[in-house]
Amino acid sequence: MSYDLPRLTPDKDFKVPSACGVSGIMNTSGKRFSGSVIVESMALMRERGNGLGAGYAAYGIYPELKDLYCFHMLYDSDLDKKNAEEYIKDHYEIIESEPIPTRKNPHIKEVHILWRYFLKPKFIPEDMSEEDFVVSTVMFINEKINGAFVMSSGKNMGVFKGVGFPEDIADFYRIDEYKGYIWTAHNRFPTNTVGWWGGAHPFGILDWTVVHNGEISSYGINRRFLEAYGYKCTLMTDTEVVAYLVDLFMRRFGYSPQLTAKILAAPLWKDIDLMPEEERKLYTALRMNYGGALLNGPFAIIVANNNMMMGLNDRIKLRPLVAATKDDFLYIASEESAIRVVCPEPDEVWAPKAGDPVVGVLKSARKTQVVLEGENG
């Protein structure tokens, strides 16, 4: 896969390996609220980025078309758009096709063709689930069709991202005009890769999205692990592997967020050795079978899909992450101030323990009475 290099912005002179800001807000009752709330949270963390990337993931924003897959697309040219649409038309019924609404912003440069499609698969192979069919579509477009990139591909959700500061990206995409029940956001300070539109966060596959602060030093191993399951990493940044790993473990394998967290941020061997026998057997098996999925390096991530939001630190907690609750709201952010600016008096505020997830689940989707899980560190 190749991309038009002039749109890439070198960032080698701006390397600060501990920056980036993340924020997530969820209403566990499914009540939708304006995107302006998450924008206010991100604006407070402006200094955590350098203008080379920002973005938002929103859930519940297309209620009238909630049963259709929505592809948010980025194109380099009209020819790239034509080539991608020919492929999409061969495999999907296009119910609606339109530009992603934007407004002019003086700080947003090198704007690409931004389009969205509401789709229904035409034919699903017998040996493939509908979700796997959509994943294969995304992999093909990102890898094989030059100048075309799928920003998001889930139902009743979308990713909006680009090169700029969070407030400018929000203004450009008119985020204040959308309402959703889960919002996540990212302010980028690129460390090892270039700042470009496709490399901004969130990263997504189906309705899964990930925003990430840190550095995945195990990217090469994680990438090879994922390739064995049909995932292709083409977007030139380490965070891409996290999106595919959560799709693999939580959707395809059916693992819980808690178990998935213990694969991605596995306990140290010295801690496993001290566990009770049954627990020790479980974590030993996870390490032995899924060692290629272990995320090495400092990280703080927020993962979301249509039913849940999860915050997770690396197993030593080398990046900040704070959580809070207020009534039916769950907040997760890099800084407590980014929570208090939109929720001045939360019911509870805590710093999650290293490697222990904070999980919020929609009340309508939960299987038990547990709506929120996570330990205070």
From Swiss-Prot:
Keywords: Glutamine amidotransferase
Active-site residue list: C20
All copies of domain Glutamine amidotransferase type-2, residue ranges: 20-377
Keyword Nucleus: no
Protein name: Uncharacterized protein TM_0398
Taxonomic classification: Bacteria, Thermotogati, Thermotogota, Thermotogae, Thermotogales
Source organism superkingdom: Bacteria
InterPro entries hit by this protein: GATase_2_dom, Glu_synth_lsu_1, Ntn_hydrolases_N
